[in-house]
């Protein structure tokens, strides 16, 4: 991802923050590319470049995979009209791919996380979370305060503060 970015190529990314102290994790899969001679696509943010490696960033296969990833993530989001952050990075990536909504089944209402406004100084709204872990890495590795973790497994993963207590 960084080599492509340095050459002016745009590869979408969601779980990678190109800033000092942030390491790529590759878990959102929004940055998939084709590598010549390899059967499977690779997450460009975590793939180490090697001498002679030929990376295809704009093939139909890579574009299709990235588009499907974003479409699956949008299926678990509130509709843009009611989203709390209509200008989020996810929506920017969706716009760049021409996606306004997902054609996949949307998240069931009972699975949408509730707003936590129990603290006087902050509100936590996880309804737009894509479980990428960027907030965890930011707290653990950049801020070095380790106050956010992930709980659950698979599709039922969510960020938690301390012991998943209300704020």
Model-inferred region functions:
Residues 1-51:
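N-terminal cofactor/phosphate-binding cores enriched in small/glycine residues
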Residues 29-167:
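Fe-S ferredoxin-like electron-transfer domains
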């Amino acid at each position: 991802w960084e080599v492509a970015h340095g050459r002016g190529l745009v590869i979408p990314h969601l779980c990678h923050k190109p800033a000092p102290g942030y390491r790529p994790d590759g878990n959102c899969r929004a940055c998939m590319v084709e590598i010549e001679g390899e059967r499977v696509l690779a997450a460009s943010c975590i793939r180490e470049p090697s001498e002679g490696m030929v990376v295809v960033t704009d093939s139909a296969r890579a574009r299709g995979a990235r588009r499907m990833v974003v479409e699956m993530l949008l299926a678990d989001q509130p509709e843009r009209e009611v989203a709390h952050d209509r200008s989020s990075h996810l929506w920017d990536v969706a716009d760049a791919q021409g996606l306004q909504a997902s054609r996949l089944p949307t998240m069931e209402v009972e699975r949408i996380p509730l707003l936590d406004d129990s603290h006087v100084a902050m509100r936590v709204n996880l309804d737009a979370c894509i479980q990428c872990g960027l907030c965890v890495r930011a707290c653990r590795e950049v801020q070095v305060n380790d106050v956010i973790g992930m709980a659950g497994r698979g599709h039922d993963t969510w960020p938690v503060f301390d012991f998943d207590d209300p704020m």
